[in-house]
Amino acid sequence: PIAGSMVLAAILLKLGGYGIIRMMQILPTTKTDMFLPFIVLALWGAILANLTCLQQTDLKSLIAYSSISHMGLVVAAIIIQTPWGLTGAMTLMIAHGFTSSALFCLANTTYERTHTRILILTRGFHNILPMTTTWWLLANLMNIATPPTLNFTSELLIMSTLFNWCPTTIILLGLSMLITASYSLHMFLSTQMGPTPLNNQTEPTHSREHLLMALHLIPLMMISMKPELII
């Protein structure tokens, strides 16, 4: 069910990050070197999840693995135990909650019209539903963390934190972000471009779907430009 996927990705997946933030308060704050294996594992796990996204043919599986990769960055930022790292992790959890929920919503919009989640069978939607293609483009750009979205702010904070702690981590971070951009563009091109494989009548999009997407994406830009809205 699409509602379950949206709640799972937006809220329940972030409970792990919240639990780590709570537990880190009772651990020593100065000895971050002892957490080095966990930080490396978190970044390496993010890269492996991103590589798994590249070979997915199921749309919902691709979005789910994308959520896992972003949580790797959150864990790495929390473990370093700096104010910037904590701020970046919390901001990324909020931003990715909106983004992944929006992507699952778009995947359901596509599924309701094609009755399949296979990428190669959902292509050509830019000819049929151009407004939905616009929402897909915006959601994927936010997943890549382009400015002026909250995703960009959070990943910038996390990159600064990790680079200050250990400059070598920028290699793993850069590789992770490169793969994220690759599978996000691959997802967009696979679902929207190319010839349409459908021969039947496609139902047009409804106002509620456009409203739902607007309520997902507008807060990401508003919070990034005016963070005092939630602080």
UniProtKB/Swiss-Prot annotation:
Reading the lineage from the top rank, the first entry is: Eukaryota
Q: Which GO terms describe its cellular component?
A: mitochondrial membrane
Alphabetically ordered keywords of this record: Electron transport, Membrane, Mitochondrion, NAD, Respiratory chain, Translocase, Transmembrane, Transmembrane helix, Transport, Ubiquinone
List, alphabetically, the InterPro entries matched: NADH_UbQ_OxRdtase, ND/Mrp_TM
Give the organism, scientific name. Answer: Atropoides picadoi
Question: Gene encoding it?
Answer: MT-ND4
- Per UniProt, what is the membrane topology? Multi-pass membrane protein
Q: What is this protein called?
A: NADH-ubiquinone oxidoreductase chain 4
Q: State a single Gene Ontology molecular function.
A: NADH dehydrogenase (ubiquinone) activity
Kindly give the Pfam families that the UniProt entry links to this protein. Answer: Proton_antipo_M
